[in-house]
Amino acid sequence: SDGIRLAFQPVRELDAVRGEPLFLPRRSDSAEFPLADTPCELLFRCKPNQPLTLTLGGTVLTAENARLHIQPVLGQDAVDAHLDVNEPIRVILDRGVIEVFANGGTFWAALEAEGDLLTKTVSIAGAEGLKVYPLH
């Protein structure tokens, strides 16, 4: 419908602090890289017919068969949701928080990270079109 639609999206000011992409793997559906003390935004889609796994410190996000599962740390409840695989997933990483936006803005989750997330390594498999933007 063309009516009003509520959606969760990162604030527009985020675009103003986004730098040039840091990491663009070539023809690869997997990558591993340190955050190197840099808050960042990950933007990617699920590779068709493949499971996705994103590991951020002790937090693991998986997607398979149009289902999104986030297994957080620190005693937080796990998150399970339908996933629209045609929409990109945006993950914003800061020192102590992980924010996940999916389904064209109809899904949002904020999770507390274990320790200083920016000292950790990100690992992702099963993604396509991965872009990593530093946030200044």
Task: Give the label of every model feature segment.
Residues 1-136:
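Beta-rich accessory regions
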